From Swiss-Prot:
GO terms for biological process: rRNA base methylation. It comes from the Bacteria. The keyword Metal-binding does not apply. The gene is rsmF. Coiled coil: none annotated. Its EC number is 2.1.1.178. S-adenosyl-L-methionine binds at A125, A126, A127, P128, G129, S130, K131, E149, D176, D194. This is Ribosomal RNA small subunit methyltransferase F. It catalyses: cytidine(1407) in 16S rRNA + S-adenosyl-L-methionine = 5-methylcytidine(1407) in 16S rRNA + S-adenosyl-L-homocysteine + H(+).
Length: 479
């Protein structure tokens, strides 16, 4: 594999020599950093099983190598990458997989280790959504996830990925993560803090990642990380699990941050060793039981993962000073709720008791029940999924609800051909040889919902959101 020129500050190399265990080769570290990163994907098991996905893409000639710490994760090699980018494939557009770096699958694997089944989870720094969607898949779209993102510009990307993957159990917030310990004390069964960091592990993806690197900036970042971890630990319930991770390699932002928490709260913090997380995990194991993944160990990005348990309750932080404001939604109950449910079921939209109906003017939403106790404590950017807008003739069902809730075996489902699916993704109406019988049509391809549409005469009127419409090649040549 070709090498690329990576910029290494001298002080960084000195720091890495000190941080790297004697069992690892520094020359191999430099060599690994200069190799381009292997592409990897994670199959979205909310939509398709691993076995069914592998059978589906078998004719394409894709070469998939299992990632040892993620059953649904694979390194991928494709001959047609230039002709058809991975993100433009039909399987990606319909949410069957997520393009995710292999090492970034580690934190969620650690969060759910030892058969852990949390019901309310926070992803404190969630964008662009790889780990939130991975958490949702591990939870089977049940319970609730609070996905927070401090960067306003990245919240939109986070929502787009959650929607594409058919996730219904998530609430989005836009806060500095340091507020949650005070705002939501001991409210979560599990928390993932994939902390902002100096990014030393990503040089294989970005050769200039260290252009602005300095030892001083590492210390500044570590100070912020301690405050975020402190907040996360206060938001975690006693007995709950917290995973702290970064994509950097220095000890100040990794081991030292976790040891600071232990020194601060002593017996309230228990480190949970990760040496048995997957075969050969001990090759990256630190004396504390953390995983410090240098890129040459598993041929992936550099990464750090620590898992800990909160053993006892902590004194509350000072109450937050902000005002949340009036909540603009009201629960939908009784006859109204039954009417919406029956109308949705009639077009193939189904949900269970994990989701509750709420209303705001003409909008109908589904909120995860597990998040309702947080209402009034924080301000949400988006909560649950928008199910419909009501109008004189009934309901206008929303695209994100169709992707998350539609049953592809419903009587109104209409399976598109490859050519018809390509037309659908391009925003064009479909003229099938044999039109569907029903006026309300659940459009599917590869037995996955693409949208709800209306049959008008012999055509199916395209309802694919304009902002999602694609041009160019969309399908693998021999699909």
């Amino acid at each position: 594999m070709a090498q690329h020129a990576v910029y290494f500050p001298d002080a960084f190399l000195t720091q890495m020599r000190e941080a790297m265990p004697s069992t690892l080769s520094f020359d191999e570290f430099i060599s690994a950093c200069q190799r381009p990163l292997r592409r990897s994907i994670r199959i979205n098991t909310l939509k398709i099983s691993v076995a069914d996905f592998l059978a589906l893409i078998a004719p394409y000639g894709w070469s998939l190598t299992p990632i040892p710490w993620c059953h649904e994760g694979f390194w991928i090699e494709r001959d047609d990458e230039e002709a058809l980018p991975l993100g433009s494939t039909a399987e990606h557009l319909s949410g069957l997989f997520y393009i995710q770096e292999a090492s970034s699958m580690l934190p969620v694997a650690a969060l759910f280790a030892d058969d852990n089944h949390p019901q309310r989870v926070m992803d404190m720094a969630a964008a662009p959504g790889s780990k939130t969607t991975q958490i949702a898949a591990r939870m089977g779209n049940r319970g609730a996830i609070l996905a927070n993102e401090f960067s306003a510009s990245r919240v939109k990307v986070l929502h787009a990925n959650i929607s594409r993957c058919g996730i219904a159990n998530t609430a989005l917030t836009h806060f500095d993560g340091r507020v949650f310990g005070a705002a939501l004390p001991e409210m979560f069964d599990a928390i993932l803090l994939d902390a902002p960091c100096s990014g030393e592990g990503v040089v294989r993806k970005d050769p200039d990642a260290l252009k602005n690197w300095s030892p001083e900036s590492n210390l500044d970042i570590a100070a912020t990380q301690r405050e975020l971890l402190d907040s996360a630990f206060h938001a975690l319930r006693p007995g709950g699990t917290l995973v702290y991770s970064t994509c950097t390699l220095n000890r100040q932002e990794n081991e030292a941050v976790c040891l600071w928490l232990k020194e601060t709260y002593a017996d309230a913090v228990e480190f949970l060793p990760l040496g048995d997380l997957f075969p050969d995990a001990d090759r990256a194991l630190t004396p504390e039981g953390f995983l410090h993944v240098f890129p040459q160990i598993y041929d992936c990005e550099g990464f750090f993962v620590a898992r800990l348990r909160k053993m006892s309750s902590l004194p509350a932080m000072p109450a937050p000073g902000y005002k949340v404001g009036a909540f603009p939604f009201t629960p939908l109950k009784g006859r109204e709720a039954l009417h919406v449910t029956q109308a949705a079921n009639a077009v193939g939209l189904l949900w269970d008791e994990n989701l509750h109906l709420w209303q705001r003017e003409k909008e109908v939403w589904l909120f995860p029940a597990e998040i309702e106790s947080l209402i009034g404590k924080v301000r949400f950017s988006r909560l649950g999924i928008k199910l419909a807008e009501s109008h004189n003739k009934g309901y206008r069902w929303q695209h994100e609800a169709t992707i998350a809730l539609a049953c592809p075996t419903h009587a109104h489902a209409f399976e598109l051909s490859v050519q018809e699916a390509e037309e659908w993704y391009r925003g064009r109406d479909i003229y099938p040889q044999t039109p569907p019988a029903a006026d309300d049509v659940l459009v599917t391809f590869q037995h996955q919902p693409l949208g709800l549409a209306k049959r008008i005469g012999s055509r199916i009127k395209n309802s694919y959101p304009r902002e999602l419409v694609r041009d160019g090649k969309l399908f693998t040549g021999n699909s």
